[in-house]
Amino acid sequence: PVIPVSFKLYQNFPNPFNPMTNIKFDVPATPQSSGKENVILKIYNVLGKEITTLVDKELSPGTYEVNFDGTIYPSGIYYCRMSFGESATVNKMILLK
């Protein structure tokens, strides 16, 4: 398997989605890591309120996928925020029912 060289949050697919979407991300190997890094992936609504945490654990370098089920949430814009060490990135997602 190929080990990612950079931290990356891919755009969710499909987008817009109803009710499920797939979120893929890369956890790189870093010189300062002891083999695993804590990764946090959370979903926020358009007002910036956290609605769920999809990932909050130490992960080995590699590519991962998680699913977000928007069944209980209203249509609208949501943000997927991934943090890894000192880095963070955000993608916009649209739930369209």
Role assignments for model-derived ranges:
Residues 1-13, 17-42, 65-68, 84-87:
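Glycine-centered coil/turn sites that cap beta-strands in beta-rich domains
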Residues 39, 52-53:
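Contiguous segments within soluble domain cores/interaction surfaces
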Residues 53, 57, 67, 71, ...:
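C-terminal tail/sorting-segment detector
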Residues 59-63:
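Beta-propeller and related beta-repeat scaffolds in trafficking/envelope systems
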